[in-house]
Amino acid sequence: ECSKQLGESCKCNKQCCGATVICGTIYVGGKEENLCIEKTSNNAILNFFGKIAHVVENGLSFSCD
């Protein structure tokens, strides 16, 4: 069952709520962070959360099992 919303930190995909939301890696100030992001993410969503960073294209995503 999902418990995280878009922009929240996560450990794996199924934690993230939303059909197109995955747990992906972005870089914030050179540091890796795992956040719930849209699969088709663009920076608008991340900017909304103050995470102005570059999204890894088709970034790493994490499975819980």
Swiss-Prot record:
Specify the protein name. Answer: U15-hexatoxin-Mg1a
Modification after translation is described as: Contains 4 disulfide bonds.
- What would be one Gene Ontology cellular-component term for the protein? extracellular region
Tissue specificity, in the record's words, reads: Expressed by the venom gland.
Family, similarity comment: Belongs to the neurotoxin 25 family. F7 subfamily.
Write the record's keywords in alphabetical order, separated by commas: Disulfide bond, Neurotoxin, Secreted, Toxin
Q: Which GO terms describe its molecular function?
A: toxin activity
Which segments of the protein form a coiled coil according to its record? none
